[in-house]
Regions:
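C-terminal capping/gating helix-and-loop segments adjacent to ligand/active sites or protein-protein/ligand interfaces
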Residues: 339-341, 358-407
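A structural signal for short loop-to-beta-strand junctions that line the ligand-binding cleft
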Residues: 86-87, 115-153, 182-183, 294-297, ...
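Extracytoplasmic/periplasmic substrate-binding proteins
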Residues: 37, 96, 227-313
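Extracytoplasmic "Venus flytrap"/periplasmic binding protein-like
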Residues: 52-121, 128, 155-157, 164, ...
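Short, low-complexity disordered leader/linker segments with a strong preference
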Residues: 1-33, 55, 406-413
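Glycine-centered hinge/linker elements that transmit conformational signals in sensory
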Residues: 173-177, 212-242
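Hinge/lid segment of periplasmic solute-binding proteins
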Residues: 93-144, 197, 283-285, 350-355
């Protein structure tokens, strides 16, 4: 196996000098430089993929360079503007729009439709990668929130059937919210969870109108989503004025007196580390929807793969992307990392994995943040959070929503 795993820009610079314009000493061989994010995939997975790909494509060498999330936005933008960019970059699914705005990405629409079966992609990965009808980001993997529950507390309450609708969910959560026990721990500013409730009501966080983006919390649909959030949040003691990391909800759940939290399945590892008595006692189910026919909408996080326009080996890079996004290596990735694969048609590859299967059901209804290149400006000083707190503390929802919309609109312009 020829690949090298490198970390950091200093090593990147020296490796480029060694391979010289991406060519190997043989003359026609190509070095495909891939930037992957730290901890996205295991070394074992990369070893398997690289060995198999290089065996099938002997003129190609894969050079994987591991990147830190901190500061990655500026680093990618600099790479897109340089003459020495990597050939493939893993990016967060909600970051594609800002990179596409630089006009530095290769349009992969043809490959998406012709070779990759884009009609089956998860919407929460595919939609953020599509800008004005052109596909720049190729979905790679997804992760989203589910309900993590304490099986012992459910059993003690006599709950045998997991909820499939919002109404059922509220009913059992009220049953579980007794005495010193909390039915659910839901922090007041968990805006990712609120987003799903708003989407369930056919609302939006923001929309583009006349070429400009505007906040859309002050609509009947979005306000209904906030109303449901308030009902659910009241069935526990989560703080109204902070988010899910202050304090960390995994630590709160690990105390053993909380029946449910809304979190990504991999949080179960943290919970069990904090309280080993909970090993084997955690269950998972999709966030319930308004009806039993479909789960609730959820915010989908994950990664897309992009190919810079200034890649030295664009065609060869696209072939590597097609392999990574194809069924064989998507199946391997899902089983190795417990991720949701990039297509709804691959959901059966994770059967038997309770947590990942629950996540995959929800991912079919997944969405991402508004596809504005300036959405990151909203999250810097997120006005959705104080809006939520205001409503939970009794302020008129329309008044609070209008104030938040003004700030969202300003951040997007």
């Amino acid at each position: 196996m020829k690949n090298r795993f490198l970390v950091g820009s200093a090593v990147f610079a020296s490796s480029v000098a060694l391979v010289g314009c991406g060519m190997l000493p043989g003359g026609d061989d190509k070095v495909i430089t891939i930037w992957l994010m730290k901890d996205s995939v295991s070394a074992a997975y990369l070893d398997r993929f690289t060995e198999a790909y290089e065996k099938e494509n002997p003129s190609v060498e894969l050079e994987v360079q591991i990147q830190e999330w901190t500061g990655i936005g500026k680093k990618v933008m600099a790479a897109l503007e340089s003459d020495d960019s990597p050939d493939i970059i893993e990016v967060g699914n909600t970051q594609v729009a800002q990179y596409a705005e630089s006009n530095g990405l290769r349009d992969l629409t043809l490959e998406s439709v012709r070779d990759l079966g884009s009609e089956d992609w998860l919407p929460g990965l595919a939609e953020p990668g599509s800008i004005n009808g052109s596909q720049f980001g190729i979905p790679w993997y997804a992760a989203n929130r589910v309900v993590i529950y304490n099986k012992d507390l459910f059993a003690e309450a006599g709950i045998e059937e997991l909820p499939k609708t919002r109404a059922e969910w509220l009913d059992i959560t009220a049953q579980l919210d007794q005495g010193d026990q909390q039915g659910i721990y839901l922090a007041g500013q968990d805006w990712y969870t609120l987003s799903g409730f708003i989407w369930d009501e056919n609302g939006e966080l923001a929309v583009e109108s006349g070429g400009e983006w505007e906040g859309r919390l002050d609509t009947p649909e979005a306000i209904r989503g906030m109303k449901f959030y308030k009902e659910l949040q009241a069935l526990g003691d989560g703080p109204k004025d902070s988010d899910e990391v202050k304090p960390e909800q995994e630590g709160e759940f690990a105390k053993g007196d909380i029946a449910q939290i809304i979190d990504t399945p991999n949080s179960a590892v943290q919970i069990e580390e904090k309280n080993p008595d909970l090993k084997g006692k955690l269950g998972f189910f999709p966030v319930p929807g308004k009806s039993a026919e479909a789960p609730g909408a959820v915010f989908t996080g994950g990664s897309d793969l992009i190919v810079p326009k200034n890649s030295s080996h664009r065609s060869a890079a696209v072939e590597v992307v097609k392999a990574l996004a194809g069924e064989k290596w998507q199946t391997d990735l899902a089983k190795t990392m417990s991720y949701v694969p990039n297509k709804t048609t691959l959901a059966d590859v994770i059967e038997g994995q309770e947590a990942t299967a629950a996540m995959a059901v929800g991912a079919a209804e997944g969405r991402a943040t508004p596809n504005s290149p300036k959405w990151a400006n909203v999250e810097l000083d997120n006005p959705i959070k104080p809006y939520m707190t205001a409503v939970l503390q009794g302020e008129d929802p329309k008044t609070a929503a209008a104030a938040a919309d003004a700030r969202i609109s300003a951040a997007l312009r």
